[in-house]
Swiss-Prot record:
Function: Component of the eukaryotic translation initiation factor 3 (eIF-3) complex, which is involved in protein synthesis of a specialized repertoire of mRNAs and, together with other initiation factors, stimulates binding of mRNA and methionyl-tRNAi to the 40S ribosome. The eIF-3 complex specifically targets and initiates translation of a subset of mRNAs involved in cell proliferation.
InterPro entries: COPS7/eIF3m, eIF3m, eIF3m_C_helix, PCI_dom
Subcellular location: Cytoplasm
Protein's UniProt name: Eukaryotic translation initiation factor 3 subunit M
Coiled-coil intervals, chain numbering: none
Entry GO MF terms: translation initiation factor activity
Organism classification: Eukaryota, Fungi, Dikarya, Ascomycota, Pezizomycotina
Amino acid sequence: MPAPTTTLLIEGSFTELADEFAQYIDALRKNEGASLQSEVAPLIEPLRQQEQSEEEPDRKQRDEVLKKLVGAAAVLNAAPEREIISAYNLLVHLVHQASNPDIFLSRICTYLAKPITTSPQFGPTLAISILTTIFNTLAPTDSSRFHVLLAIVAVIRQSGSSYAFEALKPQLAAQLPTWLSAWELDDEDAQKLHLAIADAAQASGDLELAQTHVVQALQTIPANESSSKEARDLAVRALTSALKSPAVFDFTSLTAADAIQALRSSDSTLFELLEIFTADTLDAYEDFIAATPLETISGGVLVDGAEALQTKMRLLTLASLAASTPSRSLPYTTIASALRVPVEDVEKWVIDTIRAGLVEGKLSQLRSEFLVHRATYRVFGEKQWAEVQGRLMVWRRSLESVLGVLRTERERYIRESMQAAAEEVGQGKSGDKGAKGGDRRRNPQQQQQSQPSQPQQAREVELVGGAE
């Protein structure tokens, strides 16, 4: 769905085009029922006179004409395939001249959301094309765009076309928050739109995006309505799809919703299961299932997901195990025991957990252990803070030990350097004395010339000694 605004270029006055459209509708009806042209003719005549005298048109009179035209426009879905787009474009052009186009556009969108009978194969494509044109003829802040987008999503859902939905997804990702803000939708309409997108995503096979919009729809429920039947049904839908989804491991957004919290009373076993998936391990899950079979939870909404639930619980258990181990090394036997799987299957489960983004690390087949580099904390409370504190203390002691070694080595280096320097100075002094004795024997005059340099040599020795 393109972003730029579209302008329809259609020649003719309102009365001429309205009369032409009425004739076209009559032709599609094939003389069934009263003539639309004869019905609108008395309404068009005053408007034609205003156009001829160049007076300001009576918009209320136009609205009366448009009520007749739009009311009969459902028959356009039976128009020849090659004429459908141009016929709807003409109607949209007329509607934009109403005092309040929103009233008529929402009804046109309803027509387009229904099947185009003359083109079963390309009907959805034609409908989306027309709806896209309508969407882009409206100002970005026009709330009528909401109804048009709903119709587009409905057509995509009914068609089940993954291609059409893939074309819409970039616009939803980039523009939907802006649209919702610009249209100033109330909670009910925002929820309606999110659920429509979720249904279209699910029909197209994008379960992850469907779950995202179900959760966003859940968040539109006010706190004072969180215990209503509608809120309960939506909360159960959101929670069950999240539990069964192979891509959802973080339940924070769900537990924060008032409607989910209200399940404590209405669906206590389902809420208890959520708490297990949020923070507990496979042991707790198996104990829970033994006492509360899936068939008894909220009418059996999770019965078809038994295998998916157990798989997810194993991955979450391994993530918790990796996050809580102090040594960052997990033996295969420990993992096998925690996951209730054979040791030879451990590597498969570790790889699946890595793919899920819950842990990072390295498998050591020689040592039969998993070396943990990073692990995701499923919850972060007092226990986790204590673990962090313990690890920080270990790192502190390690750093203090390293610092102590560095200090010792530095002191040894300084001491040895100073000792070596002192030895060099001592050797240099002995050499100077031997040289001076030989000079006195060979050349007394040269001895006298070299005497002034002695105080400087003495000062150098003192400086070195001072350094010692």
